[in-house]
Amino acid sequence: MTLLPNERIDDLQFRGLKIIQNPQYFCFGMDAVLLSHFARLKKADRAADLGTGTGILPLLLWGRYEFRHMTGIEIQSNIADMASRSVSLNNLDEKITIINEDLRNFGFGSQAGTMDAVISNPP
């Protein structure tokens, strides 16, 4: 796994999951961990994380529920790239997709109306 300058791999201490973070941008906090305990997903669920950031919610929720698929949408290209690499680091490319897009321009296309859950951790 290639790390960019100032990036690190943090062990989530949960089901062997790891995340790539860069303290010069943003590192997840307790709010993401707490939110992951409030969201309820089923194994067959398809979900979206709006403003996924580093991808912490999809990773934590995968660890809890092993959902069918989650799409994380992030506007910042460097953060979306970091989230995508975290997904790959955990071998979850078939379960979590990170899309670098502005939510105002994003259309779910053929996925429209097919999400079982939508989550977001507002700033």
Go through the PLM ranges and name each one:
Residues F38-P123:
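Conserved SAM/SAH cofactor-binding pocket of Class I
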Residues M1-L4, T54-I56:
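Accessory (non-catalytic) regions of SAM-dependent nucleic-acid methyltransferases
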Residues T2-K43:
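Class I SAM-dependent transferase core
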